[in-house]
Amino acid sequence: MADFLKGLPVYNKSNFSRFHADSVCKASNRRPSVYLPTREYPSEQIIVTEKTNILLRYLHQQWDKKNAAKKRDQEQVEAEGESSAPPRKVARTDSPDMPEDT
């Protein structure tokens, strides 16, 4: 292995002084780590990346959660008020089918 490194341009020759060819062989005998999935995903599944920024997406989610709570509280107040108040829509008294006198 020293013959292979001979002739290469280096600034500090001591960088290669501790190199031993035996250590390379021992390291290559190890089996590489392999990822084994725990779930089975369909092969036709398409992975799509989101175009929005992660920070913007997070802020929108927080804003939606905050507004959902406010909206829910407002709906409860309106529901309580509707039971005692008359309906907002009132039936029309004049019928559009009747011709007007001119």
From Swiss-Prot:
Family: Belongs to the DDA1 family.
Taxonomic lineage from the root: Eukaryota, Metazoa, Chordata, Craniata, Vertebrata
Biological role stated in the UniProt entry: Functions as a component of numerous distinct DCX (DDB1-CUL4-X-box) E3 ubiquitin-protein ligase complexes which mediate the ubiquitination and subsequent proteasomal degradation of target proteins. In the DCX complexes, acts as a scaffolding subunit required to stabilize the complex.
Ion transport recorded as keyword: no
Phosphoserine found at: 33, 95
Assembly and binders: Component of numerous DCX (DDB1-CUL4-X-box) E3 ubiquitin-protein ligase complexes which consist of a core of DDB1, cullin-4 (CUL4A or CUL4B), DDA1 and RBX1. Component of the DCX(DCAF15) complex, also named CLR4(DCAF15) complex, composed of DCAF15, DDB1, cullin-4 (CUL4A or CUL4B), DDA1 and RBX1. Part of the DDD core complex containing DET1, DDA1 and DDB1; the DDD core complex recruits a specific UBE2E enzyme, such as UBE2E1, UBE2E2 UBE2E3, to form specific DDD-E2 complexes.
GO cellular component: Cul4-RING E3 ubiquitin ligase complex
Biological process, per Gene Ontology: protein polyubiquitination; regulation of proteasomal ubiquitin-dependent protein catabolic process
UniProt modified residues of type N-acetylalanine: 2
Ranges for region Disordered: 67-102
Record keywords: Acetylation, Phosphoprotein, Ubl conjugation pathway
Pfam family, one: DDA1
Pathway the protein contributes to: Protein modification; protein ubiquitination
Protein name per Swiss-Prot or TrEMBL: DET1- and DDB1-associated protein 1
Originating gene: Dda1
